[in-house]
Curated annotation (Swiss-Prot):
GO cellular component: exocyst
UniProt-recorded name of the protein: Exocyst complex component SEC5B
Species per Swiss-Prot/TrEMBL record: Arabidopsis thaliana
Keywords assigned: Exocytosis, Phosphoprotein, Transport
Biased composition (Basic and acidic residues): 110-126, 999-1010
Region (Disordered): 1-126, 486-511, 984-1013, 1055-1090
Alphabetical list of InterPro entries matching this protein: Cullin_repeat-like_dom_sf, EXOC2/Sec5, EXOC2/Sec5_N_dom
Subunit structure: The exocyst complex is composed of SEC3, SEC5, SEC6, SEC8, SEC10, EXO70A1 and EXO84B.
Domain of life of the source: Eukaryota
């Protein structure tokens, strides 16, 4: 067919399609077979139906040739798989005379010829030979054909087949040959059975099922048919005789060789028997060939030129006469061709509208089935219109695929719909894996949601900043209005351009709101991954465990194994590890956002629940991921790592906050003592500073302890967390100890600053300063303003931390970090704390005792030098002087001050001060040996010894061993100075000039005694004065000394008191000193200790 014919045919097809679109798209079957003239399928495959062994009757033959309704439907389906070629149909009609018994010739002629043929058939039949097909006895004809075939078959075939039927597993015998219409080609050339012409396999017991399922293409058939030029013996043996034994194959080969040999002999015998015929035929052929050569040599033979010209003239006239008829005939042939093509491919032309209708109705399976039917049609290569129809179908299906892909992007799609969508896409053979497309879409959607959370958070933070700025601007304007009255200056507009100072309360409120927004942001991020990632992972598990793979398998028996392998490879091109990588990437994005936001939390509000609530949210996410089939193990470990990291940051911030808060409260000492109930009946009169420090440590350590317990629970489930937790525990322990050391250092600094200020005040008298009124106006009314009492308060704070607070808090929180530490290390930490506070206490105590020692030195100086007495000409002893009582009052004031401020340190402080007092007496005696204390007479010696015995008796509870030794040295120095003074007086008055006594003889020492005095006499005289006056003086001053001697009774001089005093006198340092001194030896004073 030429190109112009193709164009005309396309135009006719377009016109037919236009008419077809106006009809009903649903095809209705005609009511009867005679109402239409279907196009006969001339290339139909043989029907697979069993025929009876007996010859069929005439009526049966006719009935078998009549098409049924089912066969008509099958023919219509088979019509869709053949091509349209007029030339092939013409050739088929030409060859149809043998197969259809003249039916093809009847269809090829015109109506008049068919009518004439029917009239001739109705004529009388002579009964000898049938002159038309209807008079042919088809049964007899079939019998004759069968006999001819059997007569042409080698006689040994039947015998060999009959001989091999003895076993139960042998091939089908030759007697079943009559059910095959083709004859010799169905017999195995090896004479081992019969070959099925459809499947080209040897007929066995299971050949019935194989013939229905297996189809052989033409290329394979050409190689298996042994009469073909492309016959392949190896393929023939491997396919047809794949289950034949070797022995049978050998016997078959022998039979084949013998048959070939027999046929060669028969052919030679045939030539020999008909040699005359062969010679005659050869002569005839040579004659014909010579005549043809003569005709070719002389084409203008006798009369041929004239005949040729006449025929040419007739042909030209006929062409001019019948040209319109020929054109119409050609057009009619084209119309019939187009009509046949439309009839054949009517389903194809209706496919676009059918598929669109099915898709619009939601009948997706029907649309896919119709599309697959269209794909299976074998179209002629020269018909462009059919290709355009298929392109339209492809366009519709591409739109349908896009719709299915978009449906998978719906976040609310349920699992059933997803599975159905994936199944449809797999049946449509998409370019990419739809399951992987869905997983990628979901992964990008989760990332998009995380980014949207970040965008919303930044927007909320910006709104908050604008609100704070507007509030600050409004406050600034209001302050300007209050300052300038109702008049508004031009500075209001410039105020908006410049940076507005934000008030501290407003700034703190804004920081709290920012932390709240950060906590909300992390909570939303966590909710996104908790809600979506487990579902995403479960979907991936269902995909890679085969749930979608099963739905993607199409039950098409005609699909080749190569296509199945290709589909399997395409489906398995991705692994579950790639999905786990997607989830890990999502967790990494989440981790970066959480850690960045967690670092932005304000440390000032660390005790607020923002940071701890964030850690709890991450812990909930870990628990959700640890559920069955909720997330891959790597994602769980990554999320646990996020939790450990932010917990570590939180704990580090808590530790730094405790140290920073300790430093901050140390700068704000209020010097207000707490009540005994607030300090839990502690003997230390502490300020609020240790309690504030305790509150800071408890608040921080409680949060840390809660976080550590959570981390230990994580470590129990994962060994990888032990190293991180061990590092955190070490940092917590060091931070706890450093907080105490920092607090001790701050207390030491406060004490040093306070001592430095006290040394600059020269106007202090008995521990009071003249400028206290200024400090009272600054501090609270109940606060301590005296520097010495403040030093005592620092000492109490140190003692409270050392004796109570450190051990209490350490024993309470040591189990937080005691995961792998030994008990001796635990004890060493606490001992180090005690030693630190002890050393600090010694330093502050030195500041206090130094300040008090200055006061005591002043009082001692007033007592010994400025009391208005001349020790070289002292009056007689009448009792304890007022100067001694004033000196004792200084110690009483210190006792009261220490008892109220640091009672546990009372013995230590007074022991130090008493020892310092005695050393002060020694230093004053040594310093003024040549001045005010250049001489001491007997009365002065007795007075000093009485008062020293008085001091010793009262201060005995606070006399240390060193103080006792110092007192002995002091008494010896006084005795030595008295003896020296008396000796010098005697030497200066050799004439025996005697001073008249001004008082009674009992009160004065005679000149004879003074001139011949000895150390024992002086000690005896002093002991006499002491025994007569000491107890009386103790009674007089018992109220003054009650704080030192609490055992002194109120009754006047009871026997018990006397006995106590006698014991005291006996054990006094003066008596010991006297007993230890040799008679007449000079007294050497012990050097000063300080």
């Amino acid at each position: 067919m030429s190109s112009s014919d193709d164009l005309d045919e396309d135009e006719l097809l377009q016109m037919a399609l236009k008419e077809q679109s106006q009809r009903d798209v649903t095809y209705q079957k005609p009511p009867s077979a005679n109402s239409r003239k279907p196009v006969t399928n001339l290339v139909q495959q043989p029907r697979r139906q069993k025929r009876a062994a007996a010859p069929p009757s005439k009526g049966g033959a006719k009935a078998s040739r009549k098409p049924s309704m089912d066969e008509d439907d099958e023919s219509e389906v088979e019509l869709l798989s053949i091509s349209s070629g007029d030339e092939d149909e013409g050739n088929d009609r030409g060859r149809g005379g043998g197969g259809d018994g003249g039916g093809g010739r009847g269809r090829g002629g015109s109506g008049k010829e068919r009518g004439r043929a029917r009239k001739e058939d109705d004529r009388a039949w002579d009964g000898v030979e049938p002159d038309c097909w209807k008079r042919v006895n088809e049964a007899e004809l079939a019998r004759k054909v069968r006999d001819m075939r059997e007569s042409r078959t080698a006689p040994s075939v039947t015998q060999n087949l009959d001989r091999k039927v003895s076993g139960a597993d042998k091939k089908v015998v030759l007697t079943s040959l009559q059910s095959f219409p083709r004859g010799m080609e169905c017999i195995d050339p090896l004479k081992l059975g019969i070959i099925d012409n459809k499947t080209l396999r040897l007929i066995t017991e299971s050949s019935e099922s194989l013939s229905k399922a297996e189809k052989v293409d033409n290329a394979l058939r050409e190689k298996l048919v042994y009469t073909s030029d492309h016959f392949d013996p190896k393929l023939f043996i491997s396919r047809i005789h794949q289950e034949t034994s070797a022995a049978d194959l050998e016997s078959g080969a022998l039979a084949l060789k013998s048959d070939l040999k027999g046929r060669n002999l028969q052919r030679k015998q045939l030539v020999k028997d008909n040699f005359d015929c062969f010679v005659s035929c050869k002569t005839t052929i040579d004659d014909i060939e010579s005549k043809l050569k003569r005709i070719e040599d002389d084409p203008d033979g006798s009369g041929t030129t004239h005949l040729f010209n006449c025929m040419k003239s007739v042909t030209s006239r006929a062409n001019r006469a019948f040209e319109p008829l020929f054109e119409r005939q050609a057009q009619a042939e084209k119309i019939r061709s187009v009509q046949g093509m439309l009839q054949r491919f009517r389903t194809l032309f209706n496919l676009p509208s059918i598929i669109r209708s099915s898709i619009s109705k939601g009948e997706y399976d029907l649309a896919v089935r119709e599309y697959k039917k269209a794909k299976s049609i074998a179209l002629p290569s020269h018909v462009n219109l059919l290709k355009r129809v298929l392109e339209e179908v492809e366009k519709v299906m591409q739109e349908f695929k896009g719709t299915l892909y978009r449906s998978m992007e719906d976040p609310k799609i349920d699992f059933t719909s997803l599975e159905n969508t994936v199944r449809l896409l797999l049946e449509l053979e998409p370019e990419s894996d739809p399951v992987w497309h869905y997983l990628n879409v979901q992964n990008h959607r989760i990332h998009g949601m995380l980014e949207k959370c970040t965008f919303d958070h930044e927007a909320r933070m910006e709104i908050l900043r604008n609100q704070v700025h507007e509030r600050a601007l409004s406050d600034a304007k209001w302050r300007q209005i209050q300052q300038n009255g109702v008049q508004l200056s031009d500075d209001t507009s410039s105020m908006e351009d410049n940076q507005v100072q934000v008030d501290q309360p407003l700034e703190e409120s804004a920081r709290r709101e920012k932390d709240a927004l950060r906590g909300r942001y992390i909570k939303i991020l966590t909710a996104v991954i908790v809600y979506h990632l487990p579902t995403f992972w479960k979907t991936a598990l269902s995909v890679f465990t085969g749930k979608f793979a099963k739905s993607s398998q199409v039950n098409d028996t005609s699909a080749s194994k190569a296509e199945e392998k290709a589909e399997e490879a395409r489906y398995s091109s991705h692994s579950l590890e790639e999905i786990a990588g997607m989830i890990r990437n999502t967790i990494s994005v989440y981790e970066a956002k959480v850690q960045s936001t967690f670092h932005d939390f304000d440390e000032s509000y660390i005790l607020h629940p923002y940071m701890s609530d964030t850690i709890k949210e991450v812990s909930k996410a870990c628990q959700a991921f640890e559920a069955k089939e909720s997330a891959p193990h790597s994602a769980v470990m990554a999320l646990r790592k996020v939790k450990v990291e932010i917990t570590k940051i939180y704990i580090q911030r808590l530790c730094s906050w405790m140290r920073a808060s300790t430093e901050e409260i140390s700068k704000e000492e209020t010097w207000i003592p707490v009540s005994i109930l607030e300090r839990n009946r502690s003997p230390y009169s502490i300020s609020y500073l240790p309690l504030a420090f305790r509150s800071i440590i408890v608040s921080g350590m409680e949060q840390i302890n809660m976080m550590i317990l959570s981390l230990k629970g994580e470590a129990a489930r994962s060994e990888d967390m032990f190293a991180h937790i061990e590092e955190i525990l070490i940092s917590v322990r060091l931070a706890f100890l450093n907080c105490f050391l920092d607090f001790a250092a701050h207390l030491e600094q406060i004490g040093a600053d306070l001592s430095q200020r006290t040394t600059k005040r020269e106007s202090w008298q008995n521990g009071y300063s003249n400028d206290h009124q200024e400090e009272q106006s600054i501090n609270a009314p109940e606060s301590v303003v005296d520097p010495h009492r403040q030093l005592l308060m620092i000492l109490s704070n140190i003692g409270y931390c050392k004796d109570e607070l450190a051990s209490e808090l350490y024993n309470k929180y040591k189990y937080t970090w005691l995961q792998s530490r030994r008990n001796d290390e635990d004890i060493s930490d606490l001992q180090d704390l005690m030693m630190s506070f002890s050393g600090l206490g010694e330093k502050v105590l030195e500041h206090y005792t130094f300040a008090k020692a200055n006061l005591i030195r002043t009082a001692a100086t007033n007592y010994l030098l400025d009391s208005g007495i001349q020790w070289g000409a002292a009056p007689p002893v009448k009792g304890i002087r007022d100067a001694a009582v004033e000196l004792l009052h200084t110690l009483v004031a210190v006792h009261a001050e220490v008892f109220a401020g640091a009672k546990p340190l009372l013995d230590k402080i007074l022991g130090t001060l008493v020892e310092g007092l005695i050393d002060t007496f020694l230093s004053l005696l040594d310093e003024n040996r040549s001045d005010d204390l250049s001489s001491i007479d007997a009365n002065g010696f007795c007075q000093l010894m009485l008062e020293l015995e008085y001091f010793e008796t009262i201060l005995k509870p606070y006399l240390t061993v060193d103080a006792t030794e110092s007192l002995k040295s002091l008494q010896g120095a006084v005795l030595e100075k008295a003896i020296e003074s008396i000796s010098e007086t005697v030497e200066n008055n050799p004439g025996g000039h005697q001073r008249k006594p001004t008082r009674g003889s009992e009160d004065a020492i005679s000149d004879d005694k003074q001139s011949s005095v000895s150390p024992d006499d002086l000690l005896a005289l002093a002991q006499q004065c002491t025994s007569g006056m000491l107890q009386l003086e103790l009674e007089k001053t018992r109220l003054n000394s009650a704080c030192f001697i609490e055992t002194i009774p109120l009754d006047p001089v009871p026997p018990v008191a006397k006995a106590a005093y006698s014991r005291t006198s006996t054990d006094s340092p003066s008596r010991n000193y006297r007993e230890s001194q040799p008679m007449g030896s000079p007294v050497q004073a012990r050097p000063r200790r300080r």
